[in-house]
């Protein structure tokens, strides 16, 4: 089927809708960011892109720190609200009834209600155009214990995380596979893998009998 061609734009969807906290425990702000992601594995690095005109831009640039807080259905309203209101005018933590949580390595607060909070240290700022990209090293990851399973792994299916796509917020549906599943060999039932055993030849009928 033919595809419709559009002019260049931002159409890589879905992407995370995160709440980035910045500043310190006294003077802090939350900026909602969709231009964010992973850029390196070792060392673990991520990025956020922010317009220089945003109130949070100077807070992040001056401190060189920020926290990425993942969002879920419960935080959807606050996520959107913190993206359309300016920290110059309102205290977003207070207005959205969000609780500040002390981080381990950075001075800016984490958001207590977030399923996962990621402490980040800015390593470089790239001025790209409409947005400046903050390249940052991940210092620590804090996951809410209620989302940790009995094996100590993070169970993302319990978080009810939200994503942003073409102007809307969406919840993640369900897991349909895991990394490498396309080349993974199917597990066979060991009970059906019993070796064939050759029995004694029947003198009367003169044939070999096999059994599974």
Predicted regions located by residue number:
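Aromatic (phenylalanine/tyrosine) cluster motif
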Residues: 207-210
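Basic, polyanion-binding surface patches
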Residues: 1-196
């Amino acid at each position: 089927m033919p595809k419709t061609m559009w002019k260049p734009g931002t159409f890589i969807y879905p992407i995370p809708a995160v709440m980035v906290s910045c500043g310190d425990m006294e003077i802090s702000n939350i900026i909602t960011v969709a231009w964010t992601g992973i850029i390196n594995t070792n060392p673990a690095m991520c990025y956020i892109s922010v317009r220089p005109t945003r109130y949070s831009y100077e807070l992040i640039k001056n401190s060189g720190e920020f926290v990425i807080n993942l969002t879920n259905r419960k935080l959807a309203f606050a996520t959107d609200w913190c993206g359309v209101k300016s920290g110059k005018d309102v205290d977003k933590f207070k207005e959205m009834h969000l609780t500040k949580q002390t981080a381990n390595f950075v001075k800016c607060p984490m958001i207590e209600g977030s399923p996962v909070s990621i402490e980040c240290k800015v390593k470089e700022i790239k001025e790209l155009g409409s947005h400046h990209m903050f390249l940052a090293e991940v210092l620590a990851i804090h996951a809410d214990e209620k989302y940790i399973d009995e094996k100590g792994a993070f169970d993302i299916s319990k978080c009810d995380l939200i994503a942003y796509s073409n102007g809307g917020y969406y919840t993640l549906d369900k897991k349909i596979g895991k990394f490498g599943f396309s080349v993974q060999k199917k597990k066979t039932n060991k009970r059906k893998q019993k070796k064939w055993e050759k029995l004694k030849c029947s003198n009367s009928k003169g044939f070999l009998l096999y059994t599974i």
